């Protein structure tokens, strides 16, 4: 039997100020010790691709909660932002912390078919990884401190390995940059083609290819600063919403009768 666990309110911060998404009820099918419901407060952090999350984010036995809301604002927000199947909304809880690390706790809200669900990010495995990395660094530090002149060959081998790792890292960085640019081009192309279809512009029309190309080039020029930073290795990405708004604006301009 489902039971209401709590109600979540979280804040969105934007150019026009803050907006609070209210009355998100979290329900569970699992029995819980507490019979009272609480109210959680949170802050929107970012959107994520669920398919690209690290394996440690979700454990196999973690609870997934159903989300409901009677708020028209909340319903409209989730409908707009969770149209993509693999998209998730990361919320940092203001009044709840991870018991092990005493760091902020996080919820990820996502849509599964027609249902709205959420789960709390499991930081247990991450802490284990961090502990192992710290231990390994300490052991490496002790080993380096005890290296003598007779062990100089080990230093030479280590330096050679570090150079190889540096080369691999540079290759990986270039591949990552190319992937981001390719993703930008693919998303931009789909948005333009979709926008042309919505306007009833068929590819049989004489100026179809010309309209597609000038829209593509103009969108690239609009986001030239972001693309330049991406080419320099920045982790920045051009958001889907920003690119969609650019394409819509350009198509309205170019298709005026």
UniProtKB/Swiss-Prot annotation:
It holds the Pfam family Sld7_C. Its main location: nucleus. Keywords: Cell cycle, Cytoplasm, Cytoskeleton, DNA replication, Nucleus. Transmembrane segments: none annotated. The keyword Cell membrane does not apply. GO terms for cellular component: cytoplasm; nucleus; spindle pole. It is found in: Nucleus; Cytoplasm, Cytoskeleton, Spindle pole. GO terms for biological process: DNA replication; regulation of DNA-templated DNA replication initiation. Required for the proper function of SLD3 at the initiation of DNA replication. Binds to SLD3 and reduces its affinity for CDC45, a component of the replication fork. Required for mitochondrial morphology. Interacts with SLD3. Belongs to the SLD7 family. This is Mitochondrial morphogenesis protein SLD7. The gene is SLD7.
């Amino acid at each position: 039997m489902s039971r209401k666990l709590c109600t979540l309110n979280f804040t969105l911060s934007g150019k026009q100020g803050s907006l609070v998404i209210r009355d998100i009820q979290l329900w569970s099918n699992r029995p819980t010790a507490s019979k009272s419901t609480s109210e959680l407060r949170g802050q929107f952090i970012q959107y994520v691709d669920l398919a690209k999350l690290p394996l440690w984010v979700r454990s196999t036995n973690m609870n997934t909660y159903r989300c409901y809301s009677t708020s028209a604002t909340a319903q409209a927000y989730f409908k707009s932002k969770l149209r993509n199947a693999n998209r998730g909304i990361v919320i940092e809880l203001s009044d709840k912390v991870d018991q092990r690390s005493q760091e902020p706790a996080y919820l990820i809200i996502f849509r599964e078919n027609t249902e709205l669900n959420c789960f709390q990010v499991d930081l247990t495995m991450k802490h284990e990884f961090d502990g192992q990395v710290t231990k390994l660094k300490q052991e490496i530090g002790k080993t380096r401190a005890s290296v003598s002149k007779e062990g100089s060959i080990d230093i030479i081998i280590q330096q050679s390995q570090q150079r190889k790792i540096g080369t691999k890292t540079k290759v990986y960085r270039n591949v990552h940059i190319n992937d981001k640019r390719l993703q930008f081009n693919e998303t931009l192309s789909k948005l333009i083609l979709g926008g042309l279809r919505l306007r009833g512009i068929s590819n049989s029309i004489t100026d179809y290819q010309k309209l597609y190309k000038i829209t593509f080039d103009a969108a690239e020029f609009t986001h030239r600063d972001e693309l330049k930073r991406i080419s320099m290795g920045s982790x920045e990405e051009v958001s889907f919403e920003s690119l969609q708004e650019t394409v819509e604006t350009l198509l309205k301009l170019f298709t005026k009768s």
